[in-house]
Amino acid sequence: MAKSRFEYVKQYERLDRLLPETYIVIRIDGKGFHKFTKKHDFEKPNDLRCLNLMNAAARVVMSEFTDIVLAYGDSDEYSFVWSKSTELYERRESKLVSHVCSLFTSAFVFNWPKHFDIPLLSLPSFDGRAVLYPNMKVLRDYLHWRQVDCHINNLYNTTFWMLILKGGFTNTQAEEYLKGTVSAEKHEILFSKFGINYNFEPEIYKKGSIWIREPIDQEWHQQDKKFSVKQKKKMVLSILHVSLIDDDFWTSRPFLEVLLQ
């Protein structure tokens, strides 16, 4: 940038560098998606086309930022987990959040025709935020929270929409019918009224989607404390629909904690 007498205005910029040695999670959420889904006549309770589109957009973000180790998404939200040691953009919050959010949104629009056979009728938008977590326990608890939220919402929505689509209920009647019910009761409603065993519903609906960056280089061993630059370049992105809450997710993938350092 050329120097001039007007350069003094830079002093009014706010310093927003995120704390060092913390895990950065950038979460994006659909803005006004209830109206957006209604306008595009999304299937209820889940529209697999949109979930696949969200996953495709998340993959674009993961491919662009190699310091993102893991991402978790369900419905109209996605959380991107960064390596604790990342120094991208000098950890400036505004830069990181705006780049992730804008790239995700543009990837969503760009890939729309690959997943929907109708034109885009209105502009999708997403907001974003950055949250810092001090250690692996809290970071894992954050991911557990998002996945539990996915399960609770999906069980409710599945039961709610079956009552409307197949049970002849109105929205208000379905809400009143489900008021105060617990998970076991919703399972029973689905099975007794509609012959649906919720346990056999697609995992992507119940558990959400997890993108991970994983090595294909068999020379890396669990006792290794870091990956070489060459090994990182060989890594591939894989999508999973499994439980994040079980310890097995982490113990069977020890490379994740190494990458997150």
Swiss-Prot record:
Mg(2+) 2 binds at residues 29, 76. Pfam families: Thg1, Thg1C. Keywords: GTP-binding, Magnesium, Metal-binding, Nucleotide-binding, Nucleotidyltransferase, Transferase, tRNA processing. The keyword GTP-binding applies. Mg(2+) 1 binds at residues 29-30, 76. GO terms for biological process: tRNA modification; tRNA processing. GO terms for molecular function: GTP binding; magnesium ion binding; tRNA guanylyltransferase activity. InterPro entries: Thg1_C_dom, tRNAHis_GuaTrfase_cat, tRNAHis_GuaTrfase_Thg1, tRNAHis_GuaTrfase_Thg1_sf. It catalyses: a 5'-end ribonucleotide-tRNA(His) + GTP + ATP + H2O = a 5'-end phospho-guanosine-ribonucleotide-tRNA(His) + AMP + 2 diphosphate + H(+). GO terms for cellular component: cytosol; nucleus. Its EC number is 2.7.7.79. GTP binds at residues 29-34, 75-76. Belongs to the tRNA(His) guanylyltransferase family. This is tRNA(His) guanylyltransferase. It comes from Schizosaccharomyces pombe (strain 972 / ATCC 24843).
